[in-house]
């Protein structure tokens, strides 16, 4: 059974999962679709911010006490014309892919969010099919 833990402030990190371990996990498991560790850290800091217009949350997924997946949502501080939430990163350990853990993380994030959720995905990213199955669709071409 998958256990999903929500973090939304810096104090939520603990010895079992430090901020640096969260960053390292995403950096490793995002692979060629990822960003620098510095960019990942900025997204975490934004999600954990109390500043007006910022915020969000992180999810950490555990299977048999092993960290198997992570996700970051950043709030946009906008609504009506831009979705209120942006799914910045989601990654599953390659040893645990194909078990539905990525889908469970994304579904949980949608449940938690109040308002619309958007994301960017590269055309050749295999996760694109998962997002489409979960109801995401291409509305705009970004240029």
Protein language model annotation of sequence segments:
Residues 28-35, 46:
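N-terminal first-folded block
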Residues 58-60, 66-75, 86, 91:
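Conserved beta-strand in the GNAT
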Residues 81-94, 120-122:
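Conserved acetyl-CoA binding element of GNAT-fold acetyltransferases
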Residues 1-28:
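Conserved N-terminal entry element of GNAT/NAT acetyltransferase domains
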Residues 96, 100-108:
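Conserved acetyl-CoA pyrophosphate-binding loop and the N-cap/start of the following alpha-helix
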Residues 46-60:
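A short helix-loop-beta-strand connector motif used in the catalytic cores of GNAT acetyltransferases and
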Residues 103, 118, 123-142:
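Conserved active-site alpha-helix within GNAT-family acetyltransferase domains
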Residues 17-20, 105-115:
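Alpha-helix C-terminal capping segments
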């Amino acid at each position: 059974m998958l256990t999903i833990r929500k973090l939304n402030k810096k104090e939520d990190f603990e010895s079992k999962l430090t901020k640096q371990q969260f960053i390292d996990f995403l950096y490793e498991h995002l692979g060629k679709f990822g960003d620098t560790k510095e960019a990942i850290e900025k997204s975490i800091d934004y999600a954990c911010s109390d500043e007006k217009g910022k915020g969000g949350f992180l999810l950490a997924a555990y299977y048999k006490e092993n960290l198997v997946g992570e996700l970051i949502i950043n709030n946009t501080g906008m609504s009506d014309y831009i979705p209120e939430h942006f799914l910045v990163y989601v990654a599953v350990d390659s040893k645990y892919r194909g078990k539905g853990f990525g889908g469970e993380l994304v579904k949980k994030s949608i449940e938690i969010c109040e308002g619309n959720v958007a994301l960017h995905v590269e055309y050749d990213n295999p996760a694109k099919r998962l997002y489409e199955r979960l109801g995401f669709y291409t509305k705009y071409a970004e240029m």
